[in-house]
Amino acid sequence: MKVEAAPQVDPSSLLAAQKLYEARCAPCHGISGNSDGEKAAQVRPRPQRLSDRMWQLNASNERIRKVIVYGGGAVHKSNVMPASPDLAQQPQLLDGLVAVLRSFLKPQPT
């Protein structure tokens, strides 16, 4: 089983998505997706570890988009994960954010 490839986005959208991740997501998910952001310890259940290989394998890009736009409750996960409905009308930025999340998976050692 392979991790779904990150969406292709232009460099400016990727940069904007990285800044958006740092502002909206990193406080809980951590700067590298390790669920170690400054607010992570206060959140129950703990934020998803986005760098987790099994999560990356099982989460499709479409599901990730859905969680981002509609919140965790939309996929039967924690309602603590807030929705970002503004991103539904910004597909390049949304795809950029998915690409940022995909970048957290590090290659397995050979």
Regions found by a protein language model. Give the residues of each.
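Axial heme c-ligation environment in periplasmic c-type cytochrome domains
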Residues: 41-48, 67-97, 101-104
